[in-house]
Amino acid sequence: MIGLIQRVSEASVCVGNEVIGEINQGILLLLGVEKNDNEEKAKKLFQRVLNYRIFSDQDSKMNLNLQQVGGGLLVVSQFTLVAQTNKGNRPGFSQGASPELGKTLYNYFVELGRSSEILCESGKFGADMQVRLINDGPVTFSLNV
């Protein structure tokens, strides 16, 4: 499971012309599910996202996590994160989860967020979405579990 996290001052996701998820300060997470992923990996990644210290403290050091700053989490499915790009001119997706597994684990991840004490918003799995964000920093990290 791959999570690309971006520290944002605001972010939103639209399907068509409708905003279906939005946050102010927080983390935009692009989530890629691989074929060998499971609920345990989703839990592990969720805890890493929640506790990853990417927000600045009073000394301008990245020392605070999402909960400590009261930030929101916007989760968006991103199948292309799992692409193999090491050769050729076209990405390969053989490591990607089946649509059924991907949707199940994506929804499970979102439910982990919604059952926590943070604001958790979501895109729509498998939809053609437009994502808008203001990347704060910019600060972007790839988390793999």
From Swiss-Prot:
It is found in: Cytoplasm. GO terms for biological process: D-amino acid catabolic process. A Gly-cisPro motif from one monomer fits into the active site of the other monomer to allow specific chiral rejection of L-amino acids. A motif (Gly-cisPro motif, important for rejection of L-amino acids) lies at residues 137-138. One of its GO terms (molecular function) is Gly-tRNA(Ala) deacylase activity. GO terms for cellular component: cytoplasm. Homodimer. Its EC number is 3.1.1.96. This is D-aminoacyl-tRNA deacylase. Keywords: Cytoplasm, Hydrolase, RNA-binding, tRNA-binding. HAMAP family: Deacylase_Dtd (MF_00518).
